[in-house]
Amino acid sequence: MNKSIAYIGTYTNGASEGIYRLCLDTDKGNIEDLSVVARFGNPTYLCIHNNKLYTVGNPLSLDTLGGVASYNIEEDYSLKLTGASLLQGKKPCHINIIPDKSLIVSSNFHEKSINTYSLNENFDIDTSLSAFSHKDDSKMHFASITPDNKFICAVNLGMDRIELFKINSNNTLSYIENLSFYCTKGCGPRHIEFSKNGKFAYVIC
């Protein structure tokens, strides 16, 4: 019998209560034991590193605060909240972990911003470090580390633009306008992946 555990992020504007866990029976193709493991508002994007789960979101029934949270994945696959950083405004839409720099980076579609957060020695979310925001039609949709581990590459859906940020020694970000560039007008870039050799970037529009 082959079974795998999976976690599902959701919108909580309706009946959903947060992050769900399920068991997938890969022999039978069945989903079993669906249950709520973390009650948190709108955890719409999740990422996992080792025994940690990170999510975007906001407190339930309070969407005037938004941010990121970290959880321990326990031995029974339940989740235990270990850290959070919430700011005034809408929640981010995407979250990414950069383990080598003990850093979390989030992209905020509604607030037009890229935010960084520090991780403590246990890789739990500690404090907010920096925020970069535009004042134009920007809609920040995704951000990730470049293959050389020196820059943050962000996808600006609202401006059809790929933007580069330098990671400073204190893990704050500096915008590098001369390395940023526009995609085809109206293409709507949403995500970027790099080839294994680091020579190519693939943009999903």
Per-region residue spans from a language model:
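Residue-level detector of Asp-centered blade-edge/turn motifs that repeat once per structural unit
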Residues: 1-2, 48-51, 97-101, 147-148, ...
